[in-house]
């Protein structure tokens, strides 16, 4: 895959770091790519992904949400849409990227990933060139959020290595805490060729103090045993509004915008916007890094 990544630099024109002009052009509009992951299923990761996407859109951002969970893809259920096409149609040259993007009633665009990302590594040069050019058309978005699979399966590490920021979602449950530490350990020991901008989000808390306490426990353990810095981005309350929105197949940011979970999501997105992220590298570099992830 590293050879593919090198070839991709030529295809997308990203192989000239000394070219100041190209650097300046990329900074004029650089898409921010956020991967949202978790150590285990059932912690509300997909709900967080969907509602964060909507919160960014409500700030006036152009947002694309990609379902990168290759095993249990269900973003479309929360958005109440039925995608007829996915990334595999682009890879097979049956559709363009523009043709598979779904507009939603919530102000965000959606791409069904299916198992498309898992097929990229096996593409021929010609196929990769076509897909790379199609994928680069997503560069007009301000934010791309990728809802990854849970745990380490299904290309999760590739998404994490390629994203500008990575949100690890956990809950106060002991198993979720243990699994959150586990996925952080794997991320920090397997991805060795670049820093990973990790942020911790504690979902389904009953108080702000509980969220802070859980985050401090994980952050302290990560620092002590892994020597890695991870930031606490915030918490989301346990609330009946979340389940009610799932039943209605509408995001809680839409169904109940003044609920506690909605307020929490707005605060998290606001805090993220004010933070100083690592330089966003855009969609072209995302694909190059996705193909060229190095591990121990």
Would you name each region that the model predicts?
Residues 224-253, 264-267:
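Beta-strand-loop-alpha "switch" segments that mediate conformational coupling across diverse proteins
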Residues 133-135, 177-194:
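Conserved C-terminal guanine-recognition region of P-loop GTPase G domains, centered on the G4
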Residues 250-296:
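NTP-binding/hydrolysis catalytic cores, primarily Walker-type P-loop NTPases
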Residues 1-39:
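Extreme N-terminal, non-catalytic leader segments
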Residues 134-139, 153-175:
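Inter-motif core of Ras-like GTPase G domains
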Residues 33-97:
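Walker A/P-loop NTP-binding active-site region of P-loop NTPases
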Residues 171-172, 198-212, 235-242, 257:
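G-domain G4 guanine-recognition motif of GTPases
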Residues 68-142, 192, 247:
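P-loop/Walker-type NTP enzyme "switch/lid" segment
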